[in-house]
Amino acid sequence: KLDELYDKLVKNRTLQAKKLGFETYTPLGYLRMQRNCYGREEVENLRRQVKEVFVPFAESLYEKRRKRLGLEHMTYSDEQVYGPNGSPSPKGTPEEILAAGQQMYEELSPETKEFFDFMMENELLDVFGRKTKAVGGYMTYLPDYKAPFIFANFNGTSGDVDVMTHECGHAFQGYLAAEDPIREHADIGMETAEIHSMSMEFFTEPWYHLFFDKDTTEDYTRMHLEEAVMFVPYGCMVDEFQHEVYDHPEMSPRERKEVWKKLEKVYKPHMDYAGLPFFEKGAFWQKQHHIYSFPLYYIDYVIAQLCAFEYKAWMDRDYKAAWKSYLKLCRMSASKFHTELLKEAGIDSPFADGTIRKIVENLEKEV
């Protein structure tokens, strides 16, 4: 059924593109994602660099995880676990986690204190679970009130802390940019919006101890960095898979699965599904709903994560200077093209040759 649905989506999108004068859906998809300052060539160059220098680095972290777990061989099911004691969980009740978040933002900067006080005073954080509440977690913006709003379901896992860092990063940017009178400046491209959230995850690192016990603080810090690194090859794999699909819309479902299996060998060569038939036949991509619902929207996360790694290296050298740049990036919102925003903020473009190698060299010092 999933194969049948996706086949219809690919053919429909290809037909849309042809009616609009495109040879394939890909250029139309780029326009729909508002990519107005980079194109397929730049994305392909980014993926090439990831294959050359980032994949080997990520594979070394999988090997460290295998040794940490005490396994002779690590399978797909094993790699979801950080260490022999499982993955770190925060301490305290949901109310205490929210209070820790408030303390964190009060101490981080005057701007974040003002932001979080505004969120609390106006009840803009609906983060506690309750019966009949919808699942999920996200930040959205209420333009009539110039107010960010965060929705989540705290459940006692490290995901609760992720809400306090990642979603609050989105919300903080929305709060800072609220006074911009030009409405279109709020229409931020996804590759830019995710820099705000992913970078905040690193800027808040000195306060992780508020959410975890002493031992688990270090575990969470390492796990957070490891999983951010491990995501990059996967994100590129999702992107390259979609380019292949829309370049060859006539492919059968079986042929698409063969493409995925081939890409897994490039981006995640360690992968072993250990007898899970659905995944072994090349169907793992069907877990990624973006591929169905939001075509070509995934490399945005990779671009943003790489920029967040640049901020991490910067804050390790000079936290105040990195924070000043971050505030500037947030306030610029979408007033410039994405590549211009990076240049203005002092961040190297991930598309440029050598940037990803430099990022990996800095990350190697961390781990």
Question: What is each stretch, according to the model?
Answer:
Residues 1-149, 348:
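Contiguous, non-catalytic segments that form substrate-binding/exosite surfaces or channel walls
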Residues 36-44, 79-90, 110, 145-158, ...:
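Glycine- and acidic
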Residues 46, 50, 93, 97, ...:
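Hydrophobic (often cysteine-bearing) scaffold residues that line and stabilize catalytic clefts
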Residues 52-53, 177, 188-216, 224-225, ...:
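Post-HExxH zinc-binding segment in Zn-dependent metallohydrolases
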Residues 115-121, 185-186, 213-224, 255-257, ...:
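Beta-strand segments within the central parallel beta-sheet cores of soluble alpha/beta enzyme folds
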Residues 159-167:
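Short alpha-helical catalytic segment bearing the HExxH-like zincin motif
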Residues 169-183, 203:
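Catalytic Zn2+-binding segment of zinc metalloproteases
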